[in-house]
Amino acid sequence: MKPLRLLSTDLDGTVVGDNDATRRFRDFWHALPDDLRPVLVFNSGRLIDDQLALLEEVPLPQPDYIIGGVGTMLHAKKRSELETAYTQSLGTGFDPRKIADVMNRIAGVTMQEERYQHGLKSSWFLHDADAAALGEIEAALLAADIDARIVYSSDRDLDILPKAADKGAALAWLCGQLRIGLDESVVSGDTGNDRAMFELKTIRGVIVGNALPELVSLAHQDNRFFHSTAKEADGVIEGLRHWGLNPR
């Protein structure tokens, strides 16, 4: 088993939720020796500005990189050229207005607030959708010549993204730029929109104790995924210890 060089973690319900647990995660992270502390990536459905504001409110360690908007945005404070390169890698032609025209004709769908939208992410609410309902949405988009990716999680949140974007694809791209192998990386999460990170080949994962069944099912399929008994940030600490990361 290779040493860990990178952690990519979801925020809400994973390292954010219980401030005491978040503080314990921060202290655990800061206690790691400088030569063993992995690159820290926050990988959330929140947009970048929202994540930066959150960092002012909760006791998290400072990340090295931020992936936002379910894999549609990258913030790299020390390597800003990566931000432009990643956006360019997603291609052109994604049109939220055209997507909205299609979605507004679908029963049961409502658009999320403006603060959850941006030029490469169209976000909606659709409660308790099954595979057939999601398939109908995908077919309606294709009929309108919209080739996009649908990410559905928490039996409610529906994100429509460029075909090349999701949390996993963004992480794989970043690891490639940093020359860090996926087998040297670990991911942590709690819902279905984190699933794309776990589906990357050779990556290891931590599924926190409060995770939804849509993600917990992965723990029963592959021993690369550790299902913590502890919840939220305490569960991430438990998982990192399982994968051999400990303060000296």
UniProtKB/Swiss-Prot annotation:
Molecular function as annotated in GO: phosphatase activity
CDD domains: HAD_SPP
Entry EC number(s): 3.1.3.79
Pathway: Carbohydrate metabolism; mannosylfructose biosynthesis; beta-D-fructofuranosyl alpha-D-mannopyranoside from D-fructose 6-phosphate and GDP-alpha-D-mannose: step 2/2
InterPro entries: HAD-like_sf, HAD-SF_hydro_IIB, HAD_sf, SPP-like_dom, Sucrose_Phosphatase
Protein keywords: Hydrolase
Catalytic activity: beta-D-fructofuranosyl alpha-D-mannopyranoside 6(F)-phosphate + H2O = beta-D-fructofuranosyl alpha-D-mannopyranoside + phosphate
GO biological process entries: disaccharide biosynthetic process
SUPFAM superfamilies: HAD-like
Family annotation (Pfam families): S6PP
Gene3D superfamilies, A to Z: 3.90.1070.10, HAD superfamily/HAD-like
Induction: By salt.
Transmembrane regions: none
UniProt activity-regulation remark: Inhibited by the phosphatase inhibitors fluoride, molybdate and orthovanadate.
Entry's family note: Belongs to the sucrose phosphatase family.
NCBIfam families reported for this sequence: HAD-SF-IIB (TIGR01484)
Protein name according to UniProt: Mannosylfructose-phosphate phosphatase
Gene, per the UniProt record: mfppA
